[in-house]
Amino acid sequence: MMLGTIVKSVFTLQPGYSLRALNNKCRLALQIARQWPELNAFLQRMTAALGQQGLQRLGVDCIGVVQWPYLSKCWEAPQRLEVVASHFEVLAGQFPALLLLGRDESLTLCELSSHSPGCRLVLDRPIWFKREGELVLNLFQSDLRVASLAFSLCRSQGELCLFIGAVQGIHKGIDSETSLAIYRDLTKDFEGLRPRSLLIEALKCLARTLGVAHLYAVSDACRHHRHAYFGNDKGHDLAANYDVIWLEHGATASNHADFFALPLAAVQRAEQDIPAKKRAMYRRRQVLLDDVFARLQAVLPGSGHNLELQGEQGDVSDEMASAGPRPPVVDSLK
């Protein structure tokens, strides 16, 4: 079964029969052979965490990390495999209500319509973020993704860590003038808090609630797009500078050279540091954030029955029970 999955992955992850596609297939097969001990251990861990049915629902995307970059351009294949395996072990063992496997699955974590019509916070794992994290926290306005943060969880030296691999705004299919108008209106609705900043605060709340000890965000120089896998020119097309975004939100250097450390504490300004004419707005903003935090904490682990499941996730609890005992906790990134 495991060998069949690996063979299938070569044809699925690198489709087509052009010279380039055949070359990519050969490169992937070579990487699989080189990393076979680590890949074999990885698939055993994934099967123990998810069960055979769960692993089938997840698909073969996870095997692709033996070849392509993941979260950071600096990570080698063994580290990439380790983090993916740890992510699913953590969720399956500790937070099964947040375990998303299929690319069409999503969880509505928090309705924000009382603050801005049609807005909500949604957790999902769309295919285009497959190299930047296993989960994506999004701010939606109706069906439009206004802002997204892709991340993975893993356990390192006994502590739970969260690694952010991407931050994204409204897609390029929406013209810039319309996008700016949406951002402007939402910033007004959120009491002067930009949509991306609201999303970062929501992710920090999620991290605190799950017991995350360290929150890391990939540096701009180490974004996965800058890996040689994509060629020499791909990195030149990137618009947003991640370093600027993270530093605006209190980031500092971390013990991982390719990641910043973000503070877990919620942002809060002392009243004496706020101009008098803006204090009322900041008080309303704090009420908004407190409401969002309370809503998130109410539906995160311990209250899984409150989560609104979408797509075809099915009954996570039943599937986990059928998969056997929970896997042991394994340290990553040693």
Task: Identify the residue ranges that each predicted region occupies.
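A solvent-exposed, charged loop/short amphipathic helix patch at secondary-structure junctions
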Residues: 170-190
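Short amphipathic alpha-helical segments, especially helix-boundary/capping motifs
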Residues: 111-113, 176-181, 198-199, 219
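Short, contiguous, well-structured surface segments enriched in hydrophobic/aromatic residues
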Residues: 162-168
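Terminal substrate-recognition subdomain of acyl/acetyltransferases
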Residues: 1-134, 142-147, 155-160, 172, ...
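Conserved acetyl-CoA-binding loop-helix of GNAT-fold acetyltransferases
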Residues: 191-204
